[in-house]
């Protein structure tokens, strides 16, 4: 491991410490094994038909493998049958992020939710290995300050933090009150 990879992982971990204490209130599957976790206060984003509600923090695991485990066992992994995943991921609801660890050089990540760990690990080693000419965004985190942290190992700098293209995330202060009932997507 190079010093650059270790330094990059340390910088990324530093960028993620602000989410410690944020509570997960919505967890769901997207296409395939894409995992979405909304945390912290609720933010309304305007839509064509209706507004949608997202977390002030939104974690999206896309082109990476993942699993949930506690200290004793693996609870579920990304290639389980969808109904099993949909049931098991609900264990994160109501749990707070207590720690985030980033492991170089591949920028594997461990998000600890009150003792239940979400482990994220890359399935590609080079930019474009899944589809020519495109970055392989392993996972991303929308943050309250209006930017997106994207992790793309193999793409030079393994991660970036850039302004969100969603205007409401850039200009609107998040509602930090605790949600009484998670909204449905």
Put a short name on every predicted segment.
Residues 1-185:
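Surface-exposed, interaction-prone regions used to assemble/regulate multi-protein complexes
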């Amino acid at each position: 491991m190079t010093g650059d990879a270790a330094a990059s992982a340390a910088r990324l971990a530093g960028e993620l410490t602000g989410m410690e204490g944020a509570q997960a209130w919505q967890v769901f599957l997207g296409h395939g094994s894409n995992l979405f976790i909304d945390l912290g206060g609720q933010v309304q984003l305007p839509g064509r038909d209706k507004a949608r509600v997202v977390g002030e923090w939104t974690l999206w695991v896309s082109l990476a493998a993942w699993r949930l485990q506690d200290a004793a066992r693996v609870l579920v992994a990304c290639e389980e049958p969808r109904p099993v995943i949909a049931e098991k991921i609900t264990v994160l609801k109501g749990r707070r992020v207590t720690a985030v660890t980033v492991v170089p050089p591949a920028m594997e990540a461990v998000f600890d939710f009150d003792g239940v760990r979400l482990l994220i690990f890359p399935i590609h080693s080079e930019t474009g290995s899944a589809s020519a000419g495109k970055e392989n965004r392993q996972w991303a985190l929308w943050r309250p300050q209006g930017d997106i942290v994207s992790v793309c190992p193999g793409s030079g700098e393994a991660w970036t933090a850039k302004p969100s293209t969603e205007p409401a995330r850039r200009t609107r202060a998040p509602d930090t009150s605790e949600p009484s009932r998670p909204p449905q997507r």
